[in-house]
Amino acid sequence: MKLEKKFWGASFLLLLVSALVYLPKVASFGYYNDDWYVMFDAHVQGVKAFYEIWRIDRPGRTLLMAPLYNLFGMDPLPYHITAYLFRFLGGMSLLGTLRMLFPKRFFFATVASILFTIYPGFLSQVNAIDFQSHILGLFLALLSIELTVKAILAPSPKTRVLFTIGSILLGWAYLSQMEYFIGLEVFRLAIVLMLVLRGKGKSFKENFTTTLLRWLPFAAAPGGFLIWRLFIFETDRRATDIGAQVGQLFSSPLVGLWWLVHLIQDMINVLLVAWGYPLYTIAYQMRLSDTLIGFGMAAFVVLIVVVGLYWGKDDDVEREATSNHGWMREEYWLGLLTIIGGLLPVILVNRHIVFPGFSRYALPASVGVAILLAAIIEQLYSRSLRMALVGFLVAVSVMTHHA
C-alpha cells in the first residue's frame, strides 16, 4: 500500500512539473515552421491533404492527424494541449515501467521519469502539429514496453496473453508514426534480458534460450513492421528508404567508420551537450524580463521537485535496494544500451543530432539518458549532492523550454 501511494505521489509530481514546464504560455502558441504548410494544405484541400503529404514516407501519420483536424480544425491550441498530454503520458509509461522493474526505488524511478519528460534536448515541443506524431509515437512505444513488462510479470496466462497482444498492437502503432523509433526495441529486449538474468543459477545457454523465447512474441511488432516497410511499402523519399541508406555501407568501407564516429558524437550530444548547448544558444536571445521570469520559474519547479523527492524518501529501503551492485549494473547497462539503440537507426540512415535544428533525433535516446543519469545520481552517497544535481538538471530543462 505504501509503494502504491508513492507511485501516485510520483505521478502527481510528474504532472505538476511537466505542466509548469510546458503549459504556462500555451495559450499564446501558434503555428511554427512546418506547421504552417501542413495546416495551409489541410485548409485548402481538407483531410486528404495529410495523405498526400505523408503517403511517400509515413502514411500512418494520416491516421493521427486526420481525426485531430476533424476535431480541432485550424485552432492551434488543442494541438498544443494534446502534444503536452502525450508527452506527459510518455513520462507516466516510463515511470510505470521502472516502478515494476525497481519497485523500491522511488528516487530513481521518479527522477528518471522527470528528466525524460522535460528533457532539454528536444526543442520542437512547440511545433505541436508537425511533431504531434513524434510525441505520440514515443508515448505509444513506452506504453508498449510497459505492457511487455506487465505480460512477463503477469501471474495468469490469460492476462499474459492480453498484455502481449496489447504490446504488439501498440508496437505497430508507434512504428506507423515514426520508423526510426524502432531503436527503442533495444530497450524492450534489454528489459527482457534483465528480468531473465535475475533468475540465479542458470547457465549462459539457458539464459539465452529463455530470453529469446520470452522476447519472441514481442518481436512481432518490429518484425512485422520491417517486413511491410522493406518488402511491401514503396517509398519515394530516399531519406526514409531503409534499404538505400543501409546499402551505403557496402559502397565504401569508410561509411561504417563514420557511423561509429557519429554514434560516439551523438552519445556525447544526448548525454552532455543537451544539458548546456541548447540553453546557451537560445537564452541570449531573451529579454531581461523573460530571463528573470525563467529563473523564477526554474527555482519554483526545482523547489517542487526537491520537496516531492523528500516526501517520498525512505532511506532504509532505498539504501537496501541500491546496496546490490548487480542492480547498479542493471541500471547503467539498461540506460547505455537504450541510448545506443535509440541512436543507431538515426546513424544508419545517415542523420546526425544537431541542436537545435535536428533535436528530434534525440527523442528515443532520451529514455536511456534519463535512466543512466538517474542511476548515477542515485548512487551518490551525499543526499545534498543528489538533490543539487537533480535541481541543476531540472533548472536547465525549465530554462531551456522557457527560452
Language-model segments: residues:
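Polytopic membrane enzymes that build or remodel cell-surface glycoconjugates and lipids
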Residues: 1-403
